[in-house]
């Protein structure tokens, strides 16, 4: 299983090979604070409706200053290296609001956040904060699963007349459906780590067992239709 994971990691990370040391470090930090949870017998239900034996709770990183700072600085570095002439940072509500604000502060850039639905009172805003038409925006997410909610935020920013030049996140599950969605939306995506890298580190360090890997492999074959114990 370890050999399999390593081959997948190598393939999936070719486009961001220069981040490989950070991929390993990010994976180790997420596992150390137990941001990755496994419940094969009592699977989680995602917002998409998918059942999953694994859940990544990146909100936990906010409670650990060392991990929080690492993610902030690495996302800021990635944005500085990968995207030019950034005018503003946008966080996707709710998980990416604090991390997005931290990244914007590190880069000394304006920050806004995008709600999933407009407020039902007051100004009824979908985007909180100020964007001006023509601004180049990088969106911050806490993690990427199917990409649906992330790309809704992109659409909202574009409707305001701004240009979304990319998205960054701490983690992605790397589903083909998400990769296709980002490609179709013409949104470059860069993440600090990914499912395969985290699982490789988890197996190597004893965080998961080989029987867990078998369950996860079955889930990965068809996550939209996977059911516990089947």
Model-derived segments and spans:
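Conserved acidic residues
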Residues: 87, 135, 165
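Short, glycine/charge-rich flexible loops or terminal/linker lids adjacent to PRPP-binding catalytic cores
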Residues: 100-138, 146-152, 205
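Active-site-facing substrate-recognition patch
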Residues: 22-84
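The feature captures the hydrophobic core positions of alpha-helical coiled-coils
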Residues: 16-19
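Short, small-residue-biased leader/transition segments that mark boundaries at the very start
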Residues: 2-4
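Short glycine-rich phosphate-binding loop at a beta-alpha junction
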Residues: 84-93, 168
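PRPP-dependent phosphoribosyltransferase catalytic core
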Residues: 22-30, 155-230
